[in-house]
Amino acid sequence: MIRLAALALAAALALGLVGCDTSSIVPGGSGDVMPNPAASQTGTTPSDGQDAAFQMHFIDVGQALSVLVECDGQFMLYDGGNVDDGSLVVSYLQKQGVEQLQYVFCSHAHEDHVGGLAAVMAKFPAGHAYSSVMEASTKCFNDFVKYTQQQGLQLEVPSVGTVWPLGSATVTLLGPVTQYSETNNTSLVLRIDYGNTSYLLTGDMEKTAETDLVNSGANLKADVLQVGHHGSSTSTSYVFLNAVLPEMGIISCGVNNKYGHPHEETLSILRDAGVDVYRTDLLGTITVSSDGQNYTVATEHFATDAELNPTDPAVSSTAQQAYIGNVNSKKFHLPSCANLPAEKNQILFSSYDEAVAAGYSPCSSCIK
């Protein structure tokens, strides 16, 4: 897949983005806002996204998640934010020209994911409605079920490996691969493929389920990753990120939220892996558009790289490369190494010298 630098769309209102400010960010740069850059590693001229047959909208629903996916005029929705976000999500879908939804997915039964889906089901006819569970003891989940049934539909729990068409894109259920008592780990994990581009939606999946998913042998490699659990340190392990190898990570979280999301530990891991980070708390609604070969990004607001990555080595002279040690072999690796140990056998070093001082030797494959 040909990777494009993030592209700002001056015509964001034509895409139906909420608000009037649009921007583009060049992650890893000097921290300055770069208006409307359009660069490609291979020299391919990117489109502005308006004519793209595929779009993925990470709707700004604050400390919650809602993702609208469109391909060839067909739509699916992954989560609906909180109950109070229902009218916002409905309005956004209407602005995008949604008249019906092929699929509605509730990643898991927490209110910040299922809450707004009742309002969506009350407004838009759907082909199918899916969830990781059939029952939950919350009013918001039961309201989702009620409005689903009022359409004459039954809520379905899909099986891993199920593949759905969405226009010329395909949507595949990768997880959860086993049963969990922790609700976050029951999140439906979806892989979306469109042409040579790929996208991964993970809900609030945490590290235990990430490890199980990696061990399942599922094809996790994706260009764009919805970073799990709003950027919490309970998600996004080195092992999982090494399997996905995303170019872009999108975090849906609220401004100054009480949980401190995204956590610095997660941002550090993403930096170490060279992932470009986009956050709804700083950028508002984020729209990824693709023609099947390239993808572009539009954001509702401006933000500098220094804001997106407050301790990014590119803007902090004191930051150092992190290394991962193997407590059994006493070797240490770059986070991108293909030979990383299991997470339980990992130890993190903040510098090369620290690892050597601890008695570890560098991996000959990744550290030259």
Language-model regions, residue ranges each:
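Compact, charge-rich alpha-helical regulatory domains located at protein termini
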Residues: 337-368
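Non-globular, low-confidence helical/coil segments that flank catalytic cores
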Residues: 2, 17-319, 339, 345, ...
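SH3-family beta-barrel domains
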Residues: 314-330
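Bacterial N-terminal signal peptides
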Residues: 8-16
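Residue-level signal for mature regions of secreted extracellular proteins and peptides
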Residues: 13, 330, 356-359
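Hydrophilic extracytoplasmic domains
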Residues: 288, 320, 353-357
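Short aromatic-glycine-(Arg/Gly/Cys) micro-motifs in beta-strand/loop hairpins
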Residues: 326-342
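Positively charged n-region of N-terminal signal peptides that target proteins for export
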Residues: 1-9
